[in-house]
Amino acid sequence: MKFQPLGERVLVERLEEENKTSSGIIIPDNAKEKPLMGVVKAVSHKISEGCKCVKEGDVIAFGKYKGTEIVLDGTEYMVLELEDILGIVGSGSCCHTGNHDHKHAKEHEACCHDHKKH
């Protein structure tokens, strides 16, 4: 099933955290306070045509209580607002698209500025 986020939202498939330590101790869910991570599966047109700070395939970090859970074709996803994304894992900046001659310089600058606040 295809899903197109609206507004400034992204569709994310969660990456599950390890439930055991290297020595085999099981970590209860309530003891985990780390941000969650996931892979971006779809971005809204407003993001893909605007600031382009997040794209499909990016691994992102987001807060534990952010977003809305949905199930599509038996797979659980999160729909997140752009502002709820804490950062892109493995990226030096939100300008990782390499598109430095884009037409939306003001929007891109504002988007990068917003992400630096986090």
Swiss-Prot record:
One of its GO terms (molecular function) is metal ion binding. Keywords: Chaperone, Cytoplasm. Its main location: cytoplasm. Disulfide bonds: none annotated. InterPro entries: Chaperonin_GroES (IPR020818), Chaperonin_GroES_sf (IPR037124), Chaprnonin_Cpn10_CS (IPR018369), GroES-like_sf (IPR011032). GO terms for cellular component: cytoplasm. It is found in: Cytoplasm. One of its GO terms (biological process) is chaperone cofactor-dependent protein refolding. CDD domains: cpn10. The keyword Cytoplasm applies. Together with the chaperonin GroEL, plays an essential role in assisting protein folding. The GroEL-GroES system forms a nano-cage that allows encapsulation of the non-native substrate proteins and provides a physical environment optimized to promote and accelerate protein folding. GroES binds to the apical surface of the GroEL ring, thereby capping the opening of the GroEL channel. Heptamer of 7 subunits arranged in a ring. Interacts with the chaperonin GroEL. Belongs to the GroES chaperonin family. This is Co-chaperonin GroES. The lineage of its organism: Bacteria, Pseudomonadati, Campylobacterota, Epsilonproteobacteria, Campylobacterales.
